[in-house]
Amino acid sequence: MQHYGVNGYSLHAMNSLSAMYNLHQQAAQQAQHAPDYRPSVHALTLAERLAGCTFQDIILEARYGSQHRKQRRSRTAFTAQQLEALEKTFQKTHYPDVVMRERLAMCTNLPEARVQVWFKNRRAKFRKKQRSLQKEQLQKQKEAEGSHGEGKAEAPTPDTQLDTEQPPRLPGSDPPAELHLSLSEQSASESAPEDQPDREEDPRAGAEDPKAEKSPGADSKGLGCKRGSPKADSPGSLTITPVAPGGGLLGPSHSYSSSPLSLFRLQEQFRQHMAATNNLVHYSSFEVGGPAPAAAAAAAAVPYLGVNMAPLGSLHCQSYYQSLSAAAAAHQGVWGSPLLPAPPAGLAPASATLNSKTTSIENLRLRAKQHAASLGLDTLPN
């Protein structure tokens, strides 16, 4: 005897098709009174189950069993208690085993297949929720990065404004050097008018060198150029600067007086002084020695060699200047002969003739080279 299980019920209780037909008629009459009543599938009785089927389906089911057609199962409606039990179990584990599913089915009065399918759907729902959360987090991170990027893009704008404001300040760093040069030029231009009274008192100076008739502005420019480039002090340029004993020494000493005394500047002053004395040395060999005021004039001219320079023996570089003074004494007795003041007006023609013979450019260049070679200044740094 075959038993065909339909939702927990067997068909062996039905003995004939007539009995089944009678049940069907009764169920149809009951369904007409309450057509909107659709209880849960598990709560349906056999009469209610048969009420939804046609007579042909009942005959086919009785003859061939329930496997002759594809069964259409209605959607299971879970109660609140069933859902609560299922959710608690899902919080414990997402993959319950068979034993856990059987117990849960007994507790919730649900078939084990429904429990298994519910867990499968619940896992799919959980994965979908996780993906949506990840997408939201990524979107928030992108928005945060975009806001940070905009903040960084906005932050450099004040920096660029500062950079645009800074270039005008860069030329402002040059004024100290420009001020220094302008001060040196101003001091040279101030020293140039001081030279002019000496030139006016010395009528022989105008007859000595025709190049001495340059304007004070030209002298100041020459001094500025000489201070800017030390290499410009060639023997040819040395012949232009010294004109008078006081005049040739005032310009460089005045411009150097604002800065500390250094070895390089002392060398420059020494070269200028020696170039100035080259034009004056030959006077001591041809003319009578200066009177008593000559020593006073030499003493008055000495402070212009530097910042109130002491005698060579009392300087810090004593050995260096002793060697220089020895070489200078060996060469024409430069330091021994005093700097001569302006001679009387009667000796001007004779001195002019001597000057025209001895102060030519070639002789002066030769004298400067010989003097530099004797002092060993060619090996010194320029």
From Swiss-Prot:
It is found in: Nucleus. Residues 71-130 bind DNA. A motif (OAR) lies at residues 359-372. Functions as a transcriptional repressor. May repress OTX2-mediated transactivation by forming a heterodimer with OTX2 on the P3C (5'-TAATCCGATTA-3') sequence. Required for brain development. Residues 1-156 are annotated as: Interaction with OTX2 and is required for repressor activity. Its main location: nucleus. The keyword Nucleus applies. Keywords: Developmental protein, DNA-binding, Homeobox, Nucleus, Repressor, Transcription, Transcription regulation. Gene3D superfamilies: Homeodomain-like. CDD domains: homeodomain. The lineage of its organism: Eukaryota, Metazoa, Chordata, Craniata, Vertebrata. PROSITE patterns: HOMEOBOX_1, HOMEOBOX_2, OAR. The keyword Aminoacyl-tRNA synthetase does not apply. The gene is DMBX1. PANTHER family: DIENCEPHALON/MESENCEPHALON HOMEOBOX PROTEIN 1 (PTHR46639), DIENCEPHALON_MESENCEPHALON HOMEOBOX PROTEIN 1 (PTHR46639:SF2). Homodimer or heterodimer. Forms heterodimers with OTX2. GO terms for molecular function: DNA binding; DNA-binding transcription factor activity; DNA-binding transcription factor activity, RNA polymerase II-specific; DNA-binding transcription repressor activity, RNA polymerase II-specific; identical protein binding; RNA polymerase II transcription regulatory region sequence-specific DNA binding; sequence-specific DNA binding; sequence-specific double-stranded DNA binding. Residues 128-252 are annotated as: Disordered. Changing R123W: Found in a patient with global delayed development; uncertain significance. SMART domains: HOX. One of its GO terms (cellular component) is chromatin. Residues 178-191 have a biased composition (Low complexity). This is Diencephalon/mesencephalon homeobox protein 1. Belongs to the paired homeobox family. GO terms for biological process: adult feeding behavior; adult locomotory behavior; brain development; central nervous system development; developmental growth; negative regulation of DNA-templated transcription; regulation of transcription by RNA polymerase II.
